[in-house]
C-alpha cells in the first residue's frame, strides 16, 4: 500500500529515478525553464529548491553537497555566485509550474517548470 509514501516513484527503479532527477535539476538550473511531464515537474521542484537553498546558504559544506548532486561543476559555482542576489529576500518558492497542453503521442499531462 502507498500510505505515507512521500517520494514520487515516477515508474522507475531508485537508481534511475535519482539519476533522472539529478539530470533534470542540472538542466533546469542551466536553462532556467524546461518542459517535462507534470509528475516529473512536481518531483523536480523539491530537488531544485533544495539546491537553491544550499546556494543561498553559501557555506563550504553546502557547496560540496551541491557539487555531489549537480553534474556540472561550473554550473554550481555560477549558481552560488548568483543565488544570494537573485533569491536573497525570498524564503522558498523559487520555482513555478505551469500546465501546458497534453503530449500528442501518449496524452501525458505536460508542464513547464521555471525558476522565478
UniProtKB/Swiss-Prot annotation:
Cytoplasm among keywords: no
Annotated Gene3D superfamilies: Ribosomal protein L17
Keyword Ribosomal protein: yes
Domain of life: Bacteria
InterPro entries: Ribosomal_bL17, Ribosomal_bL17_sf
Pfam families: Ribosomal_L17
Keywords carried by this UniProt record: Ribonucleoprotein, Ribosomal protein
GO MF term set: structural constituent of ribosome
GO cellular component: cytosolic large ribosomal subunit
One of the GO biological process terms: translation
Endpoints of the signal sequence: none
Family membership noted in the UniProt record: Belongs to the bacterial ribosomal protein bL17 family.
PANTHER family reported for this sequence: LARGE RIBOSOMAL SUBUNIT PROTEIN BL17M, RIBOSOMAL PROTEIN L17
Subunit structure, as described in the record: Part of the 50S ribosomal subunit. Contacts protein L32.
Name listed for the protein in its UniProt record: Large ribosomal subunit protein bL17
Organism: Prochlorococcus marinus subsp. pastoris (strain CCMP1986 / NIES-2087 / MED4)
Amino acid at each position: 500500500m502507498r500510505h505515507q509514501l512521500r517520494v514520487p516513484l515516477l515508474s522507475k527503479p531508485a537508481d534511475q529515478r535519482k539519476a533522472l532527477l539529478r539530470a533534470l535539476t542540472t538542466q533546469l538550473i542551466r536553462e532556467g525553464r524546461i518542459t517535462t511531464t507534470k509528475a516529473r515537474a512536481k518531483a523536480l521542484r523539491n530537488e531544485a529548491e533544495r539546491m537553491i537553498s544550499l546556494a543561498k546558504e553559501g557555506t563550504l559544506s553546502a557547496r560540496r553537497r551541491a557539487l555531489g548532486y549537480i553534474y556540472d561543476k561550473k554550473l554550481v559555482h555560477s549558481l552560488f555566485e548568483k543565488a544570494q542576489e537573485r533569491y536573497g529576500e525570498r524564503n522558498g518558492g523559487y520555482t513555478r509550474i505551469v500546465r501546458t497542453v497534453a503530449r500528442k503521442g501518449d496524452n501525458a499531462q505536460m508542464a513547464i517548470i521555471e525558476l522565478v
